[in-house]
Amino acid sequence: SLTKVIVTTSSIMKLIEMGKINLYDYLKEYFPELPAKKEEITIYHLLTHSSGFQAIVKLWDKDLDYQQKIKYILDLPLENEIGEVVNYSDPNFILLGELVQRVSGQNLNQFSQDQIFKPLNMQNTAYKPLANLEEISKNKIAAAEYCSFRDRMIVGEVHDENCYALGEISGHAGLFSNLNDLSKFVRMLLNKGTYNDKKILSKLTVKTMTKNWTENLKQNRALGWDLINNFRSSGGILFSDKAFGHTGFTGTSIWIDPGSELGVIFLTNRVHPSRDNVDIISLRPRLHNLIAAVLN
């Protein structure tokens, strides 16, 4: 799920900077097939997980083509009133990924490569790494777990079942990277949008993206990003109140604290050999507290 912030949120903010979209545009403008009862949903609602969509949807067992799967999501009944509840939701970011493609004319891998990864010289970051990265082989990629419907151990292909069912490129999951590349991305955000004289986002965009957009709701969210001032935050309790971050299901996380000019990238394959190990939930905040205390 680091894909949600590294690729999708960054891409949406780039499109906003380009004047292609606006945060408060109605989803209906880009998805005319959206049912009328959902016409009040905006890009803002998707980015802050306040659209009302459910947390998870099963697409991998549906005999549908790609666009039919998008329509299936659009037709899902809402679990909450629009704008009333923050409920972390994969469907939100699947739709945002499709929105990037409809507006830019490029799929997420192409758009993020052109706008983010190539300018940052992130040479080991891509969707579908075995097909899209030179000199990358399976023995250089951490294994995930055995997948029953694929009938194989997952190595070098996306772990997330829905992303796999969507062609391995989606807004909610699927990105592969490494520590060196992600450190460039984190430094770019710590430096307010610029790294090695390459401006990826404007200072104002980074500031706007990482502020609290859901103060009136029970959970604090930035645009795409999680915020530190939430109950039982994975970022712990010692980062400054400016900190923002995100986690990934397979055992990854990024936390960035502009207040102390600190970024923490934590990459594991905790789902190998099985997703049953959930100790990382308690480990993450303890790790971040330790790092914050030592370095401050």
Describe each model-derived feature in a short phrase.
Residues I280-N296:
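Surface-exposed amphipathic alpha-helical segments
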Residues S1-Y24, F93-Q101, L182-F185, E261:
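Active-site SXXK
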Residues R270-P273:
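A short acidic/small-residue loop/turn micro-motif
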Residues T3, N22-K37, K118-L120:
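Short, glycine/proline-biased beta-turn/loop segments that scaffold the active-site neighborhood
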Residues G245-G248:
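Short loop/turn motifs at secondary-structure junctions and domain boundaries
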Residues T250-G263:
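Short, surface-exposed beta-strand/loop micro-motifs that present aromatic residues
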Residues K37-K242:
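Short, surface-exposed loop or secondary-structure junction motifs
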